[in-house]
């Protein structure tokens, strides 16, 4: 049985879906005003891995990852660029999909857009007002009254008083409490707006996910995921909105209380992936260590980046550096070299359990333990290297495939990747042919010169009785 660390209860719990025939997972997606960065890459890869594993375990999963296509940043960027919001959104949604495809991330089953769900958001806000959880302000905004939700702060583990003292809150004379957050923003000149009972305006960020998840999944569902930075306030606010509107919780006995109040959530399991740091520092544009996925993929093969992300446990901080990416590249190269030297036979995991498969499955069932699962892959590769057993090589490829690795032709991986060395495959093959002729002519100086030239471009040659093969270093 799969065990999942639940951020809400701060402990591992057996995964027991509300309806085993209809497992539902919602992940907060991207705000599409710029190219995706490494933090986005981690969210995409981590929850792709989780979706793949749940399906491997036989669960019929519906995976939803939303797109925020209306936001202050989107409005500002479109104005700055002199383009419409629709044009900006379309451009960066396409770029997001291209980045995800490159990283081997399967498309979610549903990708709802915020602007396609405005009526649902308005309806939820109306319900919150009727339930005494929200109030219209004199300026045309609508706010959530956090004091009216007794369990507020349960996800972050803080009381309202703790939050008021420790968090920077917006000073707003229209709020009843500084911690109250906006559900509906009154229209501003030149900004997109929709009609509502409170006047023209647009939704706040937090209500978007509550309304979209409720529209697709109903009042309760199994898994809600996202980056650790969303735990507070975004996910905290989602709970307040969703439970405040429906009055329904997931029915799970979380066996805990929050400052004297029973824990109440519409979601059974809350999952959060850890932060990405760059050379030990927080990734930020102000520090000049902010990297988009596209920038990284100019230097590294996309599968290397995916492998780098999966080598760390999803909840742990992940430290990005060239040294760590180079190490990941070398490690993945070793696995593909094994599959090059011993071509994989067909292997059916459902019919061929062995010690390696059992340990891999046990690792993944323990809160998606990719660190231990990847370690099993390397032990298995070591056995394949010793035995040249094509059946075991097939097992290696099949296990890697569960988490989206090792599915390419080994030669294509070893000779492919980001071509930052300046030599195309054709140029390399030509140099190798010239070196072969030089060796046949016993022109050792020319042969060495070509080898040195290839080494300068990080092209590694492997001479054997069957000829010369090569890979990018």
Swiss-Prot record:
Quote the record's cofactor note.
Binds 1 zinc ion per subunit.
The Gene Ontology terms for molecular function here are: ATP binding; cysteine-tRNA ligase activity; zinc ion binding
GO cellular component assignments: cytosol
Ranges spanned by the short sequence motif 'KMSKS' region, renumbered to the chain: 282-286
- Sorted UniProt keywords: Aminoacyl-tRNA synthetase, ATP-binding, Cytoplasm, Ligase, Metal-binding, Nucleotide-binding, Protein biosynthesis, Zinc
**Gene3D superfamilies on file:** Cysteine-tRNA ligase, C-terminal anti-codon recognition domain, HUPs
Where do the annotations place ATP binding?
285
Query: Coordinates of motif 'HIGH' region in the sequence?
Result: 30-40
- Binding site residues for Zn(2+): 28, 209, 234, 238
Q: What's an example GO BP annotation here?
A: cysteinyl-tRNA aminoacylation
Cellular compartment(s): Cytoplasm
EC number from the UniProt entry: 6.1.1.16
| Protein family per UniProt | Belongs to the class-I aminoacyl-tRNA synthetase family.
Subunit structure, per the record? Answer: Monomer.
Q: What is this protein called?
A: Cysteine--tRNA ligase
Species of origin: Neisseria gonorrhoeae (strain ATCC 700825 / FA 1090)
- Gene name, per UniProt, is cysS
């Amino acid at each position: 049985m799969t065990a999942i660390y639940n951020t809400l209860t701060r402990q591992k719990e057996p995964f027991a879906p509300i309806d085993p025939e209809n497992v539902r997972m919602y992940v907060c997606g991207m705000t599409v005003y710029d190219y995706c960065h490494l933090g986005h890459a981690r969210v995409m890869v981590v929850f792709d891995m989780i979706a793949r594993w749940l399906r491997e375990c036989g669960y019929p999963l519906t995976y939803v990852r939303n797109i925020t296509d209306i936001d202050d940043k989107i409005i500002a960027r479109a104005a700055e660029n002199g383009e419409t919001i629709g044009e900006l959104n379309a451009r960066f949604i396409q770029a997001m999909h291209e980045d995800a495809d490159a990283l081997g991330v399967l498309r979610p089953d549903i990708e709802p857009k915020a602007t396609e769900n405005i009526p649902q958001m308005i309806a939820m806000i109306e319900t919150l007002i009727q339930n005494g959880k929200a109030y219209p302000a004199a300026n045309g905004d609508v706010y959530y009254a956090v004091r009216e939700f007794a369990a507020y702060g349960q996800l972050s583990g803080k009381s309202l008083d703790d939050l008021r003292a420790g968090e920077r809150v917006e000073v707003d004379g229209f709020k009843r409490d500084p911690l109250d957050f906006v559900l509906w923003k009154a229209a501003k000149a030149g900004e997109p707006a929709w009609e509502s009972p409170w006047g023209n305006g647009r939704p706040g960020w937090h209500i978007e996910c509550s309304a979209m998840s409720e529209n697709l999944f109903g009042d309760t569902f199994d898994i809600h995921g996202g980056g650790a930075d969303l735990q507070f306030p975004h996910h905290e606010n989602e709970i307040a909105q969703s439970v405040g509107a429906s009055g329904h919780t997931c029915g799970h006995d979380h066996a805990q209380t929050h400052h004297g109040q029973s824990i109440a959530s519409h979601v059974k399991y809350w999952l959060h992936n850890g932060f990405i740091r760059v050379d030990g520092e927080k990734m930020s544009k102000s520090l000049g260590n902010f990297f988009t996925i596209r920038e990284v993929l100019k230097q590294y093969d996309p599968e290397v980046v995916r492998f780098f992300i999966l080598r760390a446990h999803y909840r742990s901080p992940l430290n990005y550096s060239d040294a760590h990416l180079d190490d990941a590249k070398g490690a993945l190269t070793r696995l593909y070299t094994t599959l090059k030297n011993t071509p994989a036979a067909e292997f059916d995991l459902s019919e061929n359990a062995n010690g390696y498969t059992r340990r891999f499955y046990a690792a993944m069932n323990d809160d998606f333990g990719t660190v231990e699962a990847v370690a099993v892959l390397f032990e298995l590769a070591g056995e394949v290297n010793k035995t040249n057993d094509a059946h075991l090589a097939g097992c290696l490829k099949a296990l890697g495939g569960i988490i989206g690795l090792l599915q390419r032709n080994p030669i294509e991986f070893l000779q492919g990747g980001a071509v930052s060395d300046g030599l195309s495959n054709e140029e390399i093959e030509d140099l190798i042919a010239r070196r072969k002729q030089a060796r046949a002519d016993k022109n050792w100086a020319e042969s060495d010169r070509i080898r040195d030239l290839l080494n300068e471009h990080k092209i590694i040659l492997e001479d054997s009785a069957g000829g010369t093969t090569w890979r990018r270093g």
